[in-house]
Amino acid sequence: MLRIGLLAAILCSSAYAAEPSPFDEAFQALYNFQFQASHQAMDRYIAAHPQEPLPYAVRASVYLFYELDRLGILESEFLIDDKRIARRERPPQPDLRIRTQFIKALDDAQSRAEVMLKSDPNDKAALFALCIAQGVTTDYMAFVEKHQFRSLSPAERSNSYAQRLLRLDPGYYDAYLTAGLSEYLVGSLPFFIRWFVHFDNVNGNKEKGVRNLETVARDGHYLKPFGKILLGIVDLREKKYREAQKLLAGLTHDYPENPLFRKELGKLNAKLGDSGN
């Protein structure tokens, strides 16, 4: 499963600014699969705010999504088939240039967030940046490098940062994405693997995980669309095709430049015998 996101652009005292920010621009472009435009928005912000960790976490997220799209890993047939996710006979070959830039962005986010946490252990922006950095590390290791078991370590760390953030601010809705995904992920693991992993404040309750994702899809800001994407994947995995169709129709309307949303909606309409009109 995938996950991605960020805090507001205007200092961390207000997570959800009313005025569109460079981060709004970056995420709008990301959800439209306009990766270069998303990078450009973050490049401009970093030029003015080089010591903030948040834009580097977004930059890493854009690199991740570029690779997932390039390798066809975001196709529904892949994401709903655990055997295809785990298959290792012909692992996808990562773009080494992108991988280098991805790791650099992660290091930049991590180092800056750690400096902020030394000054204030409860800094929400730093915690969220680390949550995102560990989350995209998880996805890269699991989906691109095919190291599913090893990817559980950064997944645990990402969840730990999300749980710390939610204890500080239960209304920090974007953080529920990682918390919800962790619940669903642990609940989907085989028992013998669950025995060896521990996620902070996570019991493997898949229903609770879905409720957390619904919270993001309803009340989130930057990750609101991603909450809908993950709910759509859950619905497809659980054969709730009408619910998935509604989510995909909304995403296609909101992000018309995203070819994957249109393609997946078309496949689902055909499966259900709908015209899609």
Feature names for model-found ranges:
Residues 233-277:
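A cross-kingdom marker for long, charged
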Residues 47-54:
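Short, solvent-exposed loop/edge-beta patches enriched in aromatic
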Residues 19-41, 51, 62-122, 129-171, ...:
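Short coil/linker segments at helix-helix boundaries
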